[in-house]
Amino acid sequence: MEHYSLAQLSKALHNREFSSVELTQHCINKIQSNKDLNAFISLDEDQALKEAQSADLVLKNGEGKPLTGIPMALKDLFCTKRLNTTCASKMLANFQAPYDATIVTKFKQNGAIIIGKTNMDEFAMGSSNENSYFGSVKNPWDRERVPGGSSGGSAAAVAGSLVPFAIGSDTGGSIRQPAAFCGISGIKPTYGLVSRYGMVAFASSLDQAGPFAKSAEDLAMILHCIAGFDSKDSTSADRVIPDYSTEIKKPVDKIRIGLPSCFFQPQVEKGIQDAIHDAVKLFENLGAEIIEIDLKLQPLWVPCYYVIACAEASSNLSRYDGIRFGHRSKSASTLIELITNSRSEGFGNEVKRRILTGTHVLSSGFFDAYYLHAQKVRRLIRDELITILNSVDVILGPTTPTTAFKLGEKIDDPIQNYLADVFTVAANLAGLPAISIPTGFENKLPIGLQLMGKHFSENRLLAIAHHYQQHTNWHLANPNKQG
């Protein structure tokens, strides 16, 4: 049952081929037998089984929704009443929120079973999931390699078939990059499509929640459940949400694909370039029109992103002072010492680095030179992408310049870690939707293909990804069945 699609699982549960309790227990057993992946920070086994029993009663009565009785995992930065919300940080190691995030409420309303909360880079800052207070997550394809970050636990849980699907967050590539490294599908929705209420903030103008699953078809089913306006989120978009599962089944014709030459640079591994070119050829054979495009501002994507992201992080993380909530130092005799020591002890090195960087670019002598300038460049990047997307349906390229690297290989070189997001940050800067889907292997390691589309074009984006997956089997590959 672990290799069923979500639609197949839903049908089997509704037809009583197996019970939600059996499915949930199977997932719990898988998690327990794969503890070395370190994908989870917390589990809620007893409650999950209770909810599975309730789901079985609903299903027995011929009721239930598409996700009723299906277990899932949640990145540990979404607030939950029952489980701690740690953000993989010592600062919040014992924090329990008094409310559920909107996305959690929506899953409960749709009958999904939250089995636990997944490991991540601390406060979602990282590209390898090595920055966690609870230890590194390992890649199911090679346990000596990283799963990507910051949503590495969610990606590893899905890739390792521990759960049918999981939720992550994406600030600069934190859904798409782990999806690529772990050989699964993941989508960053348009900014504002999915509520951020109850999602602990890293960079508020960039953060967006989204799902991981094996296929675009599964992503469509999940996205339909979580998308929609939320009055509790001031950035939430008030739009009619289409039925993505229906939309992806419509005929896909006259696809216009933008192919940027700058995505095929020497630093992009040859195996990845070859896999992307093979995907382009397949799209051509399926009738797509390939249009070469020029992204003149692409060299500015990463520096622009890190100035803005660090600035927002330094502001958002100023609330953790050891007084209101979070870690409180026991070695302080004055208020200043309490705040200083609590933050020094509570935050890890990468979080401290980004807070310092953000504070620097926001300081009076550098605000105009760095932060204000980066915001102007951000607008130019957004305008360039929107202009190009007026003439093509999607921009296609590799999700990452490399396949998954070894644990410890880049942990002491933050610049190399940041460059793992070189192709993904633009979607966040512009608020655009983007999806990563599997498109091959290099040395038995998965390769990801990224498609970026217009604002609120998730239906088209998912349809194109689904169209590709109907003609390939990369998304069906399983790390447990490697030769």
Curated annotation (Swiss-Prot):
It is an enzyme of class 6 (ligase). Pfam families: Amidase. One of its GO terms (cellular component) is glutamyl-tRNA(Gln) amidotransferase complex. The active site is at residues 75, 150, 174. GO terms for molecular function: ATP binding; glutaminyl-tRNA synthase (glutamine-hydrolyzing) activity. Keywords: ATP-binding, Ligase, Nucleotide-binding, Protein biosynthesis. InterPro entries: Amidase (IPR000120), Amidase_CS (IPR020556), Amidase_dom (IPR023631), AS_sf (IPR036928), GatA (IPR004412). It catalyses: L-glutamyl-tRNA(Gln) + L-glutamine + ATP + H2O = L-glutaminyl-tRNA(Gln) + L-glutamate + ADP + phosphate + H(+). One of its GO terms (biological process) is translation. Its EC number is 6.3.5.7. Heterotrimer of A, B and C subunits. Allows the formation of correctly charged Gln-tRNA(Gln) through the transamidation of misacylated Glu-tRNA(Gln) in organisms which lack glutaminyl-tRNA synthetase. The reaction takes place in the presence of glutamine and ATP through an activated gamma-phospho-Glu-tRNA(Gln). Belongs to the amidase family. GatA subfamily. HAMAP family: GatA. NCBIfam families: gatA (TIGR00132). This is Glutamyl-tRNA(Gln) amidotransferase subunit A. It comes from Legionella pneumophila (strain Lens). The lineage of its organism: Bacteria, Pseudomonadati, Pseudomonadota, Gammaproteobacteria, Legionellales. The gene is gatA.
